[in-house]
């Protein structure tokens, strides 16, 4: 992260620019909100949570950034502004590319309208709850209730709370609250005193850090945004503890969407068949090339595909030595008349197909109604030639 820059602030009076020398504008690179979001993303990278909730999610920008993480399977946003949730839910919808190249694991994203100081059992058992620039918007009554709801009732494995550092404010042109809706802004001592008390009451430990490094010469004020990272002692709640909680559904669902994933059989089948047909066609074209080479009396015999020079580099495929060895040791494709047979065992040695599904029986059941199989089901069968083939020798 770069330090903040101090830039002279100009005002406009009667259409003329006037320099206001005592005042400085602080500009962060990257912008401060992006630094806060990046802090959360770094935590997700390190801890790989499966269930994440953002309290006070606002326009859902953080959720949009988090939905790309393969470890997350449930992503929830809660906000008091229902209109904002309605207008930003579309940000979280799957893109077309996420259907073409789906996730490995399921992901459900839900936005709830409600107050962060209300108890809703659908947020129990989460790995990470984020409260980014939230607590300063709570009045004194809600702030008093906040710890018991988030740390006592929801009791996630980790909580991240960020809030403005009031000690940084004198560096800004206007030494007032940074937002008209802020009910308070704490110094580092005030925030840390509150956070340590909360951690002690609810069996958490807390570490303090921040984002928004001050300009040179002002290091004594600390970060512009102060952050507390709370980690529950002993890890997550045990499953019995979560299950003992009574169902309380006080939040109103505003938006929900589910992402396609390879855990869904229809999606797996679609991707598997597509990748299999690509590999089959590569092998078919390669076999044709060897036939042409043989006809010109300068290449290998049709049955000896692997003696072809650099066979693994055909059509851009790149394999490790171990992958090459696994492919070469598998049953080879063969031709009977105008029919080309590619054993399933062979196909499943190719990395992309192997990653999708390594179980031959399951692959057979998934593709049976989409491709032609041999009578014993051991091989995919296609025509050796088709009308789309490019045959340069005929031109």
Swiss-Prot record:
What is the tissue localization of expression for this protein? Specifically expressed in testis.
Chief localisation class: cytoplasm
For this protein, the record's SUPFAM superfamilies field holds:
S-adenosyl-L-methionine-dependent methyltransferases
Per its record, what are the GO molecular function terms? metal ion binding; O-methyltransferase activity; RNA binding; RNA methyltransferase activity; small RNA 2'-O-methyltransferase activity
Q: For S-adenosyl-L-methionine, which residues are the binding ones?
A: 79, 115
Subcellular localization is given as: Cytoplasm
What Pfam families does the entry give? Methyltransf_23
- Report the domain of life of the source organism: Eukaryota
Q: Name one GO cellular component term.
A: cytosol
User: What binding details are noted for the cofactor?
Assistant: Binds 1 Mg(2+) ion per subunit.
Could you tell me what reaction this enzyme catalyses?
small RNA 3'-end nucleotide + S-adenosyl-L-methionine = small RNA 3'-end 2'-O-methylnucleotide + S-adenosyl-L-homocysteine + H(+)
- Look up the record and name the cofactor or cofactors this protein needs: Mg(2+)
The reply to whether RNA-binding figures as a keyword in the UniProt entry is yes
Instruction: Tell me which EC number(s) this protein carries.
Output: 2.1.1.386
- Which keywords belong to this entry? Cytoplasm, Magnesium, Metal-binding, Methyltransferase, RNA-binding, RNA-mediated gene silencing, S-adenosyl-L-methionine, Transferase
Which sites bind Mg(2+)?
A: 133, 136-137, 182
Q: Which EC class, in a word?
A: transferase
One record GO biological process: RNA methylation
InterPro entries per the record? Hen1, SAM-dependent_MTases_sf
| Family statement | Belongs to the methyltransferase superfamily. HEN1 family.
Q: What does this protein do?
A: Methyltransferase that adds a 2'-O-methyl group at the 3'-end of piRNAs, a class of 24 to 30 nucleotide RNAs that are generated by a Dicer-independent mechanism and are primarily derived from transposons and other repeated sequence elements. This probably protects the 3'-end of piRNAs from uridylation activity and subsequent degradation. Stabilization of piRNAs is essential for gametogenesis.
Recorded hits in PANTHER family, A to Z, give: HEN1, SMALL RNA 2'-O-METHYLTRANSFERASE
Protein name as catalogued: Small RNA 2'-O-methyltransferase
Q: Which gene encodes it?
A: Henmt1
